Curated annotation (Swiss-Prot):
It is found in: Mitochondrion inner membrane. Core subunit of the mitochondrial membrane respiratory chain NADH dehydrogenase (Complex I) which catalyzes electron transfer from NADH through the respiratory chain, using ubiquinone as an electron acceptor. Essential for the catalytic activity and assembly of complex I. The modification N-formylmethionine is found at M1. This is NADH-ubiquinone oxidoreductase chain 4. It comes from Bos taurus (Bovine).
Amino acid sequence: MLKYIIPTIMLMPLTWLSKNNMIWVNSTAHSLLISFTSLLLMNQFGDNSLNFSLLFFSDSLSTPLLILTMWLLPLMLMASQHHLSKENLTRKKLFITMLISLQLFLIMTFTAMELILFYILFEATLVPTLIIITRWGNQTERLNAGLYFLFYTLAGSLPLLVALIYIQNTVGSLNFLMLQYWVQPVHNSWSNVFMWLACMMAFMVKMPLYGLHLWLPKAHVEAPIAGSMVLAAVLLKLGGYGMLRITLILNPMTDFMAYPFIMLSLWGMIMTSSICLRQTDLKSLIAYSSVSHMALVIVAILIQTPWSYMGATALMIAHGLTSSMLFCLANSNYERIHSRTMILARGLQTLLPLMATWWLLASLTNLALPPTINLIGELFVVMSTFSWSNITIILMGVNMVITALYSLYMLIMTQRGKYTYHINNISPSFTRENALMSLHILPLLLLTLNPKIILGPLY
């Protein structure tokens, strides 16, 4: 465990002691080394967990998310270079420090063994994210977005703290591995209903559940590129990870409580997909598509079958890489045209032909083209929901069609057609951007060859 935490901490002095022309090289190279070392975590035998210490452990559910977290830091650094080129030296270093501290908190969140430690770190990830959004966002609305983000997440997770104290008093431990062997079932009573809601609400706001999702498009649209990437790729997965961990404790209460939330998610999935078709803002479209994909994950986790769990974990990893790549592409447009409105950035295929290839690949993985892991995740979720209730196949089918529609709409609006004259003199695509896109798409394509490593503990 320390071989990931200590190098991550040492990134901070490296950043602050680097000369001006070496900051990006040093931090990106060092973080890439950390992300390559993290691949060693894949070498786990069977379904046992690696108990690093009494506080940290890692199993086949948290390992893919850990690796995704560490893989994302060099990509965020590569994506932010242009955005920060006009800032002064101290601010650059401060920004990189924020990203590093965020990665540190996330590594510890995904490996925490005690629920209360998980809660503390879960809340700690708020601080760097909030600073990144409110300090380095593009428009003045970023303060409003930061406020939404902070209060939704805080108000959602305060009841969780109360529920955790209650569990601590009844069971005597908050250790994940101990709680699995706590045999006393949680029966239907008013207090247990509230306990279930308190435990789940924090993660449902984070996911986000349809109806509690209003902070997400705001935060995504106003955040700088690194903020959007880490928000879509990892912070939403904290919600899914927490739900997967905490449903083990709340049995059989979840079967009793899940019905309205599954209905709300299925409805929200269709609604947010439909909202995507009416978006003019590119980042907002990708943000709403995230809500619709995460609704699938909520449904899968609440159904609680081995298949749906595997689908949920696969979909979380697939969505993390795909949405992060889409945000990078949207940002490469924004850096050239200084607008997120899709109608102003049309016909880019003629000017940036290589970027059009990345756009095509990203859109196709987003609409779950076979044989990508997005499709594997979605198929598992669709099959498990179908066995839960046959009528859901209608909603799932409609959702898949709408997903394909808005992905192609996004691709055609930005790449096809006649380009407008104000983008005649834009700069070509840089090697940095092509490297960034290939580092997003490469894991997706490689996971297609061996998807079982991200199917979670039940495979």
